[in-house]
Curated annotation (Swiss-Prot):
The lineage of its organism: Bacteria, Pseudomonadati, Pseudomonadota, Gammaproteobacteria, Pseudomonadales. GO terms for molecular function: ATP binding; ATP hydrolysis activity; transmembrane transporter activity. Pfam families: ABC_tran (PF00005), FtsX (PF02687), MacB_PCD (PF12704). This is Probable syringafactin export ATP-binding/permease protein SyfD. InterPro entries: AAA+_ATPase (IPR003593), ABC3_permease_C (IPR003838), ABC_transporter-like_ATP-bd (IPR003439), ABC_transporter-like_CS (IPR017871), MacB-like_ATP-bd (IPR017911), MacB_PCD (IPR025857), Macrolide_Exporter_MacB (IPR050250), P-loop_NTPase (IPR027417). Keywords: ATP-binding, Cell inner membrane, Cell membrane, Membrane, Nucleotide-binding, Translocase, Transmembrane, Transmembrane helix, Transport. Probably part of a tripartite efflux system, which is composed of an inner membrane transporter, a periplasmic membrane fusion protein, and an outer membrane component. It comes from Pseudomonas syringae pv. tomato (strain ATCC BAA-871 / DC3000).
Length: 668
């Protein structure tokens, strides 16, 4: 089905052609009222040629306005055929019909149908905006049309500042903006005084003389008498179609109406429409300042909450970490060698169990544990895995804060008697035994040594358990004496008592080890796990509080949707006017969506500004620490504002785009 309309072809082929410009064949229009069907038009046959001046006359309720709406593609026939220069309108979709209205027809309404918040020039420009005409071109054309119609001194006047006759002339200029090959005038003098009515009729006759096809819809025989052809409608039927004496005069040579210029390329036109949507949205928003402010209030509160909570959380984290940094970490490791990566470390065998015993005697040390390790082959039945064997003391799990999911750890007594017992990490237990088998009490081979599993660590991630390595632990004495055959240690892990300055303890440990060894053949590593935990906790708390604040954003978004739905209802007639002059459904949807996004973005900007103001006041009353704002939180706030505008503005925008232009124009 062909959905495109070649407007230029319509202009060209309609000139000096015997083919009717507009043809209705057996057109009927009916409406449902409850269970009853009312037929407004009945089997209408009508042909109108290019350059004609036609009057459709009839009493109120005769169906003449419905006939005009069908002729102008504002309405559709329930039955029959309507062709515009041979193009069947039933084959056209909504966008193609909008293109016909925009580029081919010009409407003049009895009630003018001007947008009250726009001046005369902007009202006239509307059809050209939807045609994608460049701003300068359409502005100049609008001014020229208004000046031609005697409104050169009223270009910046709004409808409320003009008389009825002046408003009607603005409506005529709007009808001519895109060329207006066919002018459809619905009771053009009905709301005017006699003098203004005559002026409007004189203008319409001049347009006819210039080659425009003019169709008047009226109930006044005096107005109809100006036409060269009068069609009388009664009860939905054409009861007469006659020529007047004026047809003896030579008909004007039909000239194509001059459009404002070639339309720009599609991309430029789309960008132009998007820019104009922003301009129109801005005008609409500032025209209702209080409503706009109330609409964005929820967004302002939500954005202020999110940004402020993020800043407070970051400030609190830095404040706490600053205190922790003054204490240091609570775990210190001692290794052989000068530093990490020392090639001589493997040959140094001076870390001994006696060093561990000496460290455990220090009052500022909570516990110290020896550590030896090696990668070993571990077997259970027919399952073999490579795992890291760690020979440690019973205090190791306390030092490293490793929790058990099942079983127990080995005791000092197990260590003294070199008990063949092991504790497995969660991953090792899963690999060896699989699901459904209780590892506790099972016997496995560590190298060639059979060992009984007495415990399994939890699946909780621990800094000291490598996530990509299988681990198991046995008493140091067992590992050194029965598996590895070594007396020296790989490392010593020390846990500092709570409240003790970690850095000072580290220095005491170095002094003790230097005294015992006589040379510095070791190095220490102070792990600040507490600091990392605080950072993680701080991030989690900030996220939690931010999620709570997001609820206010959602509430604000619902408020935006509610107000936008009300706005659609209040501006129904405006939507009908825009559709009548050629706006597509996508144009209407885009405008209301842009309005919603603009409301949310403005609310976001104000909310961020308020957050910084709160931060300034915060520093005046809280001296210990301050709110810390980040670029990420600001960018996130803007992103949230945009997303909320799109999500909660879509439904109102869709509802606006789905309005029927006839019903919309009929709204007060």
């Amino acid at each position: 089905m062909n959905q495109k309309v070649d407007i230029e072809a319509l202009h060209e082929t309609s000139i000096n052609s015997d083919q009717p410009l507009l043809r209705l064949q057996q057109v009927s229009r009916s409406f449902m009222a409850g269970d009853r069907e009312f037929q407004v038009l009945k089997h209408i046959d009508l042909a109108i040629h290019t350059g004609e001046l036609v009057a459709i006359i009839g009493a109120s309720g005769s169906g003449k306005s419905t006939l005009m709406n069908i002729l102008g593609c504002l309405d559709h026939a329930s039955a029959g055929s309507y062709q515009v220069n041979g193009q069947e309108t039933r084959e056209l979709d909504d966008d193609a019909l909008a293109a016909l209205r925009r580029d081919h027809f010009g409407f003049i309404f009895q009630r003018y149908h001007l947008l009250p918040h726009l001046d005369a020039v902007r009202n006239v420009e509307i059809p050209a905006i939807y045609a994608g005409t460049a701003q300068t071109t359409r502005h100049e054309r609008a001014q020229a049309l208004l000046t031609r119609l005697g409104l050169g001194g009223h270009l910046q006047h709004r409808p409320s500042q003009m008389s009825g006759g002046q408003q009607q002339r603005v409506s005529i200029a709007r009808a001519l903006m895109n060329g207006g090959q066919v002018i459809l005038a619905d009771e053009p003098t009905g709301a005017l005084d006699t003098a203004s009515g005559k002026e409007v009729m004189r203008t319409l006759l001049e347009l006819h003389a210039a080659g425009h096809t003019v169709i008047l819809v009226t109930h006044d025989p005096k107005v109809a008498a100006n036409a060269e052809r009068i069609i009388e409608v009664s009860d939905g039927e054409i009861i007469s179609d006659r020529r007047t004496a004026q047809t003896t005069q030579p008909a004007p040579e039909a000239q194509p109406a001059t459009p404002p210029g070639p339309a720009p390329r599609r991309l430029l036109a789309s960008l132009g429409l998007f820019r104009e949507a922003f301009n129109m949205a801005w005008i609409a928003l500032i025209s209702h300042r209080m409503r706009t402010l109330l609409t964005m209030l929820g967004i302002i509160i939500g954005i202020t909450s999110v940004v402020s909570i993020s800043a407070i959380g970051e400030g609190a984290k830095r404040y706490v970490l600053k205190d922790i940094q003054s204490i240091g970490s609570n775990t210190i490791d001692i290794y052989a060698g000068a530093n990490f990566g020392d090639s001589r470390a493997k040959s140094i065998e001076t870390l001994l169990p006696s060093d561990v015993a000496a460290l455990n005697q220090l009052y500022y040390i909570d516990s110290a544990t020896p550590v030896v390790g090696r990668s070993m082959l571990v077997r259970y039945r027919n399952v073999d895995v490579d795992a890291q064997l760690n020979g440690v003391s019973s205090r190791y799990f306390q030092v490293r804060n490793i929790q058990l999911a099942a079983g127990i750890t080995f005791s000092d007594q197990d260590a003294r008697r070199q008990a063949q017992v092991v504790v497995l990490d969660h991953n090792t237990a899963q690999r060896l035994f699989g699901p459904g088998v209780n590892p506790l009490g099972q016997v496995i081979l560590v190298g060639k040594l059979p060992c009984t599993v007495i415990g399994v660590t939890s699946d909780h991630k621990n800094l000291f358990i490598a996530g990509n390595t299988l681990n198991l632990w046995m008493p140091y004495e067992t590992a050194a004496g029965r598996v590895l055959g070594q007396r020296h240690l790989d490392s010593i892990s020390v846990r500092v008592k709570d409240g003790m300055p970690s850095k000072a303890v580290e220095e005491q440990i170095k002094a003790l080890m230097l005294q015992r060894h006589g040379t510095k053949d070791f190095f220490t590593n102070n792990l600040d796990s507490v600091m990392q935990t605080v950072q993680k906790t701080s991030r989690s708390l900030t996220l939690l509080l931010s999620l709570i604040a997001v609820i206010s954003l959602v509430v604000g978004g619902i408020g935006v949707m509610n107000i936008m739905l009300v706005s659609v209802t209040e501006r129904t007639r405006e939507i009908g006017i825009r559709m009548a002059v050629g706006a597509r459904q996508s144009d209407i949807r885009q405008q209301f969506l842009v309005e919603a996004v603009m409301v949310c973005l403005m609310g976001g900007v104000i909310g961020i500004g308020l957050s910084y103001a709160i931060g300034y006041l915060f520093t005046l009353f809280v001296q210990q620490w301050e709110m810390v704002f980040s670029l990420a939180s600001v960018v996130t706030a803007f992103a949230c504002s945009t997303l909320i505008g799109v999500l909660f503005g879509f439904v109102p925008a869709r509802n606006a785009a789905r309005l029927d232009p006839i019903e919309a124009l009929a709204r007060d």
